[in-house]
UniProtKB/Swiss-Prot annotation:
Record field: catalytic activity: DNA(n) + a 2'-deoxyribonucleoside 5'-triphosphate = DNA(n+1) + diphosphate
Keyword Nuclease: yes
Native source species: Nasonia vitripennis (Parasitic wasp)
Region listing for Nucleic acid-binding endonuclease, in residue ranges: 231-392
Protein name: Retrovirus-related Pol polyprotein from type-1 retrotransposable element R1 4
Domain of life the protein comes from: Eukaryota
EC top class named in words: transferase
Amino acid sequence: PFADDLAVLVEGDSRAEIEKVGKAVVKHIVERCSAIKLEVSESKTVGIFVKKPKVVGSKAVKINRKDCRKGGARNLKIELGGKSISFEQSVRYLGVHFDANLGISAHCKYLREKLVPLFSDLRKLAQCQWGLGHKALETIYKGVFVPTVCYASARWYKEGAHTDRILEDLHRQILIAITRCYRSTSYEAACVLAGTLPICIQLRVSVAKYHLRKGEDAEIGGVVIRRRPEGLKENYNRVLEVANEMWQARWEASEQGNATRELFFPDVVARVKSDWIRPDHFTSQVLTGHGYYNEKLHQLSLAKAAACICCGEPDNNLHFLLECPAFAEFRDELITPVSGGLEAPEATLMLVSSPEGFAALKEYSRVAFECKRQLENALTESDEGLSSESEE
């Protein structure tokens, strides 16, 4: 038999008092475990020194152990099996990491170190024209990322701008791997493109569901959900409804992702219901406006001019999709039958409103981007040839 994750809190007004009580507690635990034929693991036993924050006026100030005055940097000396227990900057208890200030920075760091490498490796297996498809990546996301981040969220997650920024940075890296969009794509657009709630809203949903399962009322986005024993499913649906309302308000208020919002996905609920939308390397560029477009590359100082090499017009996703004469043949064959020759945003909305429309967009994006690359390569070779003749 074995037991796991035992936590002991020892209080004291001085270091000597804590050490005295701590030694007595350790001795008592070892004796009790021995009586039932259990051993306490010396290598897995760690401690953390939590110092009471000092109060300046009416505000508590967090203590950094490295900045403590004389005697503050020395670890407590409490032995187990003849060896001093190691005192760490952060510890893990029941799967949740916390630091000396009982904050969640350590847990966020743990999530980043665990999840980012995993999805980075998956990104390598999901290249633009081969490897894992969007459906497989989405399944891994729902089965690995969401449960891992939301685990015990009712105990560690606290709403706050700093916390949300850390978690959103982590989430953004994962979404880029799933949607195969460019790294310059905003977090707001990446969430909508993937059809998944922003992570801070997802955590609020997880916390609300936890309280409802415990038979308690839940609060999300300022809305109180009254627990009804006979209607837990209805309670969950109401939580998700409020979460989507929060997401929609956030999407409409965002100053980022304009190309995605105005042309393709003004409504987040409609996007989530459109399960036929499975972004790849090519469609992500069209749906976000971030990609192989001179206008965007010029903004990033990666292209000499913002104009299209074919017609001289601003080279962006809308021009590429509906206007550039170089791709008229592909457009007439694939896009026009779906859009009916309408202009944006009616035409672009029609391309994502049905499986047939998105299939046409996907094929057009693939062949048109390949054609564009060939045209630019031919133009580059021509310019190099002219330059060589001029030098001769």
